[in-house]
Amino acid sequence: MARAIMLQGTGSDVGKTVLVAGLCRLAANRGLAVRPFKPQNMSNNAAVADDGGEIGRAQWLQSLAARAPSSVHMNPVLLKPQSENGSQIIVQGRVFGQSKGRDYQRLKPQLLGAVLESFEKVAAGADLVIVEGAGSPAEINLRAGDIANMGFATRAGVPVVLVGDIDRGGVIASLVGTHAILDDGDRAMIAGYIINKFRGDISLFDDGIRAIEGFTGWPCFGVVPWLPGAARLPAEDSVVLERLAKGRAGALKIAVPVLPRIANFDDLDPLRAEPDVELVFVRSGERLPADASLVILPGSKSTISDLADFRAEGWDRDLHMHVRRGGRVIGICGGYQMLGRTVRDRLGIEGGTLETPGLALLDVETEMAPEKTVRNSHARSTEYDVPLAGYQIHLGITHGPDCDRPSAIVDGVPDGALSADGRIVGTYLHGLFGSDAYRTRLLQSFGLSGERRNYRESVEQALDEIAGELERYLDPRWLAGLLG
């Protein structure tokens, strides 16, 4: 059986995902067969695993860090929020059903078996499994039936390292408070802790380490500084959108409306990494900028609801003005569906309005269908005649006159649509901006020249940098025990 360690946080967004990815890369660089695992994730940023089915995009990144094929068993339970209190449940890569918060709490004991089964499959043949928790184990109101944190750790017998985020303040209280609130059994699972996102002279926290050890008895396994390489990794969830810089003045301005159920927005990361692109995330209450050259409508977990919110913000008027001024639009997946004349959901798959008019920028219509398309794809752009690699995760079938001008040939089949003048583009293919040749030609069409970086290589380099930093700042004795 593989060795295993689980990183849990004092809260959400403390940096667990990046630390797990960095540790996976560090272990892989030392020749270990290492695998990531997250029992339960909640995210609309999904990936298609190499063995088919959906997993959280973060676990796909961690598998890349581990230099291992991605598997649905690396993230056996994925919750994809569709409304304020309801989610689609993906179990071992396949749609299990829909559930609201209280109903899901009753389902969790049933899902624990799938989680433990997947953990065994991931551990088989591995030297090391690095597990990521979700949220915080201190949420004792959710402890009964828990499968994401201590409920999993105790059943699987996996020791826990607690991660505290010093950048947000209150890290000592967070760690000591977690110690105080856990019961004896859960507390005994914690082997130590890591301080993450430290800025400045690390020695200034020496007294803090002594204080935490005095209150908890836990050893410190390292104080990790702010990791610049983390900014070059794909964004994990919508929390990140709230703090992304708006970009660089004087560059090509690309506007992205941020809708409540935005999905797979890591599609935009390759554009965000370009030095001559200003990617503007437009929040509620703001207008689409009049000087944007391109507007991108990203994916959505609930197209009809997000389309209603789009109109409520007045962005439909802004978008039509943008097009009249000669601006261009790209819609991906749910964004593509919004660009058509009508979106129908006669079976109530999204659980709300059965039919709504679209933005009518493409002469197409979409009918929601129960069968979900989930696959990795190879394609070729019809706009620029360059290869594309990406993936599809969508419900619905889109058809209409503009589909006679497909934006790509995906797995040998026409996909998407182009307007007659070529300024409006729709596609179901996620990941197209990560295709370097396509991104280069797209930016050239706006007058930008210059060499484009290899996006995949930049992610690989960032992972290696993070692994090197962890090797430098984590306790060498703890690392030696972990990595063997």
UniProtKB/Swiss-Prot annotation:
Gene3D superfamilies given in the database record: 3.40.50.880, P-loop containing nucleotide triphosphate hydrolases (3.40.50.300)
Ribosomal protein found in the keyword field: no
Coiled-coil regions, chain positions: none
Keyword Cell membrane in record: no
Pfam families: CbiA, GATase_3
Single GO term (MF): ABC-type vitamin B12 transporter activity
Family affiliation: Belongs to the CobB/CobQ family. CobQ subfamily.
UniProt name for this protein: Cobyric acid synthase
Organism encoding this protein: Rhizobium leguminosarum bv. trifolii (strain WSM2304)
Gene that encodes the chain: cobQ
